[in-house]
Amino acid sequence: RPFRKHGAVPLSTYMRIYKKGDIVDIKGMGTIQ
């Protein structure tokens, strides 16, 4: 998961992705794109 490469993801979003996993992973991808 190349989330670190983007670098545009806020820590709060990253932490949510790390905690919830796939569910918030979708929201994270939506934020990046």
UniProtKB/Swiss-Prot annotation:
Entry annotated with the keyword Cytoplasm: yes
Record-linked InterPro entries: Ribosomal_eL21 (IPR001147), Ribosomal_eL21_sf (IPR036948), Translation_prot_SH3-like_sf (IPR008991)
Protein keywords: Cytoplasm, Endoplasmic reticulum, Ribonucleoprotein, Ribosomal protein
Chief location category: cytoplasm
Location in the cell: Cytoplasm, Cytosol; Cytoplasm; Endoplasmic reticulum
Cross-referenced SUPFAM superfamilies: Translation proteins SH3-like domain
GO MF entries: structural constituent of ribosome
CC per GO annotation: cytosol; endoplasmic reticulum; ribonucleoprotein complex; ribosome
BP term (GO), one: translation
Subunit structure, interactors included: Component of the large ribosomal subunit.
Family the entry assigns: Belongs to the eukaryotic ribosomal protein eL21 family.
Protein purpose: Component of the large ribosomal subunit. The ribosome is a large ribonucleoprotein complex responsible for the synthesis of proteins in the cell.
Record-given protein name: Large ribosomal subunit protein eL21
Gene encoding the protein: rpl21
